[in-house]
Design a protein with these regions (language model features):
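Structured recognition/catalytic domains enriched at protein termini
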Residues: 16-167
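Fungal secretory targeting signals
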Residues: 1-22
């Protein structure tokens, strides 16, 4: 199956809206930053997208978690033409690596979703179609629920296997 890794990583960005991914790793090989991930046009790359009851007061750059930018990040569709498409086999694991040397430092789950480009090239797909969950992880231990009880805590990646029945 061919897909852009960003389509896979989009909801991982929702679950950890302070973070963004720039690299994917398949078969143990890390790819260059933004080779297979659409780059956002945000002036400050590491800038949280927020839910807001008062958007005029606390949104730094106009992106909200219930708007179109949450799918691939602000302005990311503009870089779709230069973003390469990686072929990943059904059943294979893909690891999404956080950018700017970040590690997850907030408690919470990791959720990974996929969306199929309806027709044509995935480069022309803006992510506005249907999504389905392929992976989730939450609490892994008896640690502190405000930190290290969560599987993702202090990691710089999220990994998921592409479902074997993916066309």
């Amino acid at each position: 199956m061919k897909f852009n890794a960003l389509v896979l990583s989009a909801v991982a960005q929702v679950a950890s809206a302070h973070y963004f991914f720039d690299t994917n790793i398949v078969g143990g090989v890390a790819q260059p930053a933004f080779k297979y991930v659409r780059e956002s046009s945000r002036a400050t790359k590491y800038n949280p997208i927020k839910f807001s009851s008062n958007p005029a007061a606390d949104i730094r750059d106009g992106s909200t978690a219930d708007g179109p930018d949450i799918v691939c990040n602000q302005g990311a569709f503009k870089s779709a033409g230069k973003t390469q498409v990686m072929t990943v086999n059904a059943g294979e694991e893909i690891r999404l690596k956080l950018a700017v040397g970040a590690k997850f430092q907030h408690p919470g789950p990791a959720l990974v979703y996929m969306s199929k480009a309806p027709t044509g090239s995935v480069k022309a797909y803006d992510g506005s179609g249907d999504w389905f969950k392929i992976f989730q992880e939450g609490v892994c231990g008896n640690g502190d629920f405000t930190s290290d009880a969560w599987c993702t805590y202090n990691r710089d990646w999220v990994a998921a296997k592409i479902p074997k029945d993916t066309p």
